[in-house]
């Protein structure tokens, strides 16, 4: 079972969800390379799946957790409550959708007029999908990745701000093509689904370790 992580717009901190549903802050204090992990909350429902997508809804300040088994949770870090939303589905196909293992919201800012959209990656169909309404778990494909990706995927969206409001979004994903031992870093066109390596030299885009997620700082550093 893999854990996932995300930055929270409201306080700029990185959070991780462990394989037992614990929620942690992950910090690297200035002047040291030591990672400080502190438990701050706990999901009220057991995780159901092997691979998970995690991201904060920047508008609602809720932590979204989805799984390759179709689980769809929403957690409030302020009062530590978890809502079990409807399972992931892809109408008109009946039943729970399996294979969704990465998730990311657009428009990561604190502007109250900014809306946000949740995009996922389904590695069974190798597609980018919109999850809307997110609480209903309803999925609609936007396009194909263009690669045969393994189930172990991660995604995050970096928002470029001007005057505190998002003016551009860039999606990144860690994907493991069929036959590859470890993931590579891609940019994702969320509207067409197309995955593109971040480097022209494929070796430079490849991770040395089998990482399970990607979280981009809110400042891009």
Report each predicted region and the residues it spans.
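Hydrophobic alpha-helical segments and helix pairs
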Residues: 38-87
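Repetitive beta-architecture junctions, highlighting loop-to-beta-strand starts
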Residues: 12, 21, 35, 61, ...
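Structural motif
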Residues: 20-27, 70-76, 115, 124-133, ...
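Glycine/small-residue-rich interface belts in oligomeric ring/scaffold proteins
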Residues: 1-42
